[in-house]
Amino acid sequence: MSSARSGKGKLVVDRVQTGVRVERRILKVLKGLAEYHDMSLGDLLEGIVLHAFEGKAPFRDEASLQVIADLKRIYGLDFGAEASHRLVDGE
């Protein structure tokens, strides 16, 4: 995939629609976080992934970390990264 720069530091990309399955509570937290940052869910996910690809934490500021903690509590997301390879579909 090629990309081209277009004025004022913008990066033109080719986005595709996808049907990715995501755990329900994780999705609710992500949607809430996207709303908090006034961005789309897709833009939020792209930013998280680009940070992860470089071994960087996508959220370091206390305000975002507090919002994430609050959203996790509100939506009952009671597990973290340690569970990432143990998630299985419910019946």
Predicted regions and their residues:
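Arg/Lys-rich, low-complexity, intrinsically disordered N-terminal tails that contact nucleic acids
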Residues: 1-12
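Short, positively charged interaction helices/loops
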Residues: 54-91
